[in-house]
Regions:
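Accessory regions of macromolecular translocation/handling assemblies
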Residues: 1-180
């Protein structure tokens, strides 16, 4: 029973990290590619049109005077919540679009390995292209051992059509994040 609970906990933890890193990657893509920020103009125009439609709709409803304030507050709440949901969805979609190809390539490389812990594939955390040198730097969150990464370096290069400059290393910004 404990093994199932541990497996379920690890799977939920992995999914939480994947969702969080999708948001982080989406925000990073908005910063790296300013042209994507046109999406916010489209969202603002769409919300303006939606607000006008809601006002017309509210005028056509005949609500009892006792419920009028509750109805108005509910409509204001909806007008606040819907843009927040759209913003989060757009950011997650951008993160997903940036990560899907790289993660799929790594799943092909590591998908048949029996010693991949809990069958959890690497999650793309950061992806940035250096404009001066043209080098794309990728950072993954993974539970796969360093030995397996080093054994699979050639397969990774072939499947992703890349050349790895330097060594594959552990660590995040402070070099203390062991799974990045």
């Amino acid at each position: 029973m404990e093994d199932k609970e541990v497996r379920r906990y690890n799977e939920q933890r992995y999914n939480r990290k994947r969702q969080w890193y999708r948001v982080v990657l989406g925000v990073e893509q908005l910063c790296n590619y300013p042209l994507l920020n046109v999406i916010w103009v489209c969202l603002a125009i769409g919300m303006y049109v939606f607000e006008r439609m809601v006002k017309r709709l509210m005028e056509s409803f005949h609500v009892y005077s006792a419920l009028q304030s509750v109805f108005n507050h509910c409509m204001i709440f909806i007008m606040i919540i819907i843009p927040i949901i759209f913003v989060i969805a757009i950011i997650r979609l951008l993160g997903y679009a940036a990560a899907v190809k790289d993660e799929a390539d790594l799943q092909i490389v590591f998908g048949d390995k029996r010693n991949v812990k809990n069958n959890q594939m690497p999650i793309l955390v950061h992806k940035k292209k250096d404009k001066s040198s043209g080098v794309t730097k990728r950072e993954f969150y993974t539970t796969i051992s360093m030995e397996l990464w080093k054994e699979s370096t050639e397969a990774i290069c072939d499947i992703m059509n890349i050349h790895i400059l330097g060594e594959i290393t552990y660590g995040g910004r402070k070099k203390d994040k062991g799974n990045r």
